[in-house]
């Protein structure tokens, strides 16, 4: 039963159990006051929806329940994801890029370009280190990685250094185009990464020579600039496992979740938020 607002007692909020009232009970003492309903919405309580769960598993949830992602406060999941992205991934990712570029610059200007002499003439013998297939796999993966890196950097950091220069219209079109490049090049990266792993994994298993290489700092310690190793030295093996294979698998997997290509994942917002945080963090690590 509704009630005229002018007939409502001014001290309705002082009644016992006022804070625990349902929306129907509140309407009897304060018509038009939908606070109980909106309080439940803000707490992530699932409401009624006529859509089947199989088609819209979150149709009854306007605001996600409270969670705490690494680096966020206890708040609703959408806000927690925003805090992790804007307060951790973006600023610390940009700082990591700056540190790496600075280190590369210092190394280049102190050591100079590192090249190799290729003697020519009678008696010169060349040894094939990589087959044409291995080179093709490498460059296919490298092309895909560069395209994904450029498009990812623009989407994540572009508003800080491109938007002020290009303006919102051009930057919007550029981001839209690169987002499509990101989506279509992603499968090429996934396939070429699998080929790279299967092709080179046998030569990247640790052995005793790797400990010798590490003990001499790859030739920087002890004066021996050519430390013996097998096909790949310990540094190259570390890059293969911790710079390519392991993070690459998680980047590809999280990307497939974001594209909703893995059955059972990506149907709810929390899946997308977690996948996005993993994807961004490890992609920055790989770059």
What function would you assign to each model-found segment?
Residues 1-287:
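Membrane-embedded alpha-helical bundles that constitute the cytochrome b-like, heme-associated redox core
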């Amino acid at each position: 039963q509704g009630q005229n607002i002018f007939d409502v007692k001014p001290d309705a909020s002082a009644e016992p159990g006022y804070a625990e009232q349902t929306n129907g009970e509140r309407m009897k003492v304060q018509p038009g006051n939908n606070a109980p309903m909106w309080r439940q919405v803000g707490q992530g309580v699932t409401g009624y929806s006529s859509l089947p769960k199989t088609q819209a598993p979150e149709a009854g949830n306007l605001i996600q329940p409270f969670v705490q992602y690494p680096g966020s406060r206890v708040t609703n999941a959408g806000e927690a994801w925003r805090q992790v992205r804007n307060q951790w991934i973006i600023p610390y990712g940009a700082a990591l890029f700056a540190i790496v570029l600075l280190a590369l610059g210092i190394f280049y200007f102190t050591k100079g370009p590192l090249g190799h002499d290729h003697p020519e003439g009678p008696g010169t013998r060349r040894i094939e280190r990589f087959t044409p297939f291995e080179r093709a796999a490498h460059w296919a993966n490298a092309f895909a990685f560069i395209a994904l890196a450029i498009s990812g950097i623009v989407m994540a950091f572009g508003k800080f250094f491109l938007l002020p220069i290009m303006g919102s219209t051009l930057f919007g079109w550029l981001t839209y185009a690169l987002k499509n490049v990101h989506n279509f090049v992603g499968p090429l990266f996934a396939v070429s990464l699998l080929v790279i792993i299967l092709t080179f994994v046998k030569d990247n298993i640790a052995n005793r020579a790797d400990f010798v290489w590490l003990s001499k700092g790859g030739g920087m310690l002890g004066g021996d600039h050519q430390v013996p190793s097998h096909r790949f030295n310990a540094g190259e093996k570390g890059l293969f496992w911790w710079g390519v294979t392991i993070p690459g698998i998680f980047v590809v997997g999280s990307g497939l979740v974001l594209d909703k290509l893995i059955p059972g994942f990506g149907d709810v917002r929390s899946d997308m938020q977690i996948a996005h945080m993993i994807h961004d963090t490890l992609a920055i690590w790989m770059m």
